[in-house]
Amino acid sequence: DRYYRWSNANIHRGVHVLAEEATMLYEDARRNVAGFIGARDAREIIFTRNTTEAINLVAYSWGRANLQAGDVIILTEMEHHSNLVPWQMLAQERQVRLEFIPVTDDGLLDMEEYQKLLMLAPKLVAFTQMSNVLGTINPAGEIIRLAHDAGAITLVDGAQSVPHIPVN
């Protein structure tokens, strides 16, 4: 309510008082989010409208610039469509190969199979930290460490986890 009454202006676009106030509030929010999730620098925070838009942004910017035919992306079988469809579209466009970490009967990721998939030298491992369907909390630290050891970068869909568990 306060913003709409007293600071309603475009951010980063004006030198008048309302624009400067709106920009200050926006950048304060960026710093608050960075602190909340343990980011090293507030400049690491990019605001998007939602998870789908954020992952599409990565897929169509980083993905198009860095992936080519035959490259491998590892996902999990428990992904929400926001972390599945962009990679499927990119795979079709670029002839990139998608591989999936299976889910065990008790709703956990099969980490032994994950380690086998890493032998395919993936460029990217993209996974949900907390499944919105199963409620499973995946071992993000271990998944990331193993991916980095294999030379892959990681994308963590933290939309479900950030409000519920500490992240960094």
Predicted ranges, named:
Residues D1-N168:
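Pyridoxal 5′-phosphate
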